[in-house]
Amino acid sequence: MLRTFTTHSRLINELFANYLNTFFAFCELINNSLQANAKNIWIDIDYTSNDEALQPLVIKKMVIRDDGDGVYVDDINEKLLNIGTNNKEGGKGIGRFAAFQLGQTIEIETVGKSQAKNKSSKTIIPLNYKSFGKNINVSEVQVTTKEEIFDGILKTYYQVTIMDFYDDSITDSSPKKKIVDKLLKENLAAALFERYSLKIYNRDVKFYVNNHLIDPTDYIIGSPSIEDVSYIDKAGKNHVISFRYINLKHVENRKVFLTTTNAGIQTIASGFEFDAEWLSPKIGGWFIYINSDTLGSDLYRNISLDDMDENFKHYKAFLKNQSAHFFREKNKEFDNFLDKLKQDDYYPYKDKQSSSKSKIMLFDKLAFLVEDKYNLLNEKNKLREIIYPLIDRTISNRELDNVLKSVLKLNNKTLTQFNNLLNR
């Protein structure tokens, strides 16, 4: 069937490359699936293999399929071909075209249903970016669809197939179309978990990447901690801020994500890393998701200018203080150890000061890891007389690796962290 696009006075090139990078565009397609009440999302990507050395593209083909509501044939014009309209509450109505930021050729395939008619339909819509040009009147663009109608109610789905990804000749001048690291084979599952961890943990939706289920137990330690805290802004208005703390495997840093609700989906608006010298070396990696029903997303727009934006500066200080309070509670074992360590006769800095505060801090953390492994201080083991000076000398000589590997048997990531601390 021959159908025609409609739009509302927005340039096509603005609509089709409107996201910060290709991962954000990809996530917009995922958000569309979530808005359609999908419980399962399958992502199949044909990556260029190592033996295809002359292949200029990282990705040859991407298919995103969900088991959401789908679009019935009677709604195709309004819901799929009307660009820039608000088809979903709170949404821009352009998210389904985010695929054009990844590739030039798209095929939309959907099965929708009409309960009133007791019928289902299957529609296939082929699209190509070149059909739109840069300034063409969208109402002149026609597309030939394949449509079938069936009696009864079928299982609905929505599928987007993306092909003809952009090569360097295009991405050099349009960097927003370049495939970013989060979309690479080794990174995508973790990036999806970071973006949608609460939904994945709560099993609101299941993600499959090349037939592999993203399992929250592969990423999360224990259960998320949830805390609602009162915040008073610069104008004196009170807000309830929700903190969700998730302890992670295979991650060492702590990321704070500021989220907002967009079209009914909680999405990450911005973020920053949280760190403090007093943190225990066993504190591990955490994602901290922050949300408020009363704080608008406008507050997050100036995060890069937080020293100039007093409202955001005030809010960020509150977030850091609240996060610090949470980790202080987690830090008690380390704090109690330090109290004992600094009173110990074998503590090398009990009666003399080090020339470097960072050296003392590094020693304290290494001594804590030794204690955790060998229980020297708690059992008053006299090996402290040998071990503590050994740690002190290796720090002074900048030869940590041997002790860290042979005594503590730390992994390479932790070794790197301690060496970075040493080099401060």
Question: How does the language model describe each region?
Answer:
Residues 1-5, 36-89, 116-288, 292-303:
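Interdomain "switch/hinge" adjacent to the Bergerat
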Residues 3-28:
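Conserved short strand/loop->alpha-helix "switch" segment adjacent to the catalytic nucleotide/phosphoryl-transfer site
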Residues 92:
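Flexible nucleotide-binding loop
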Residues 105-111:
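Glycine-rich ATP-binding loops of the HATPase_c
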Residues 244-408, 412-419:
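GHKL/Bergerat-fold ATPase module
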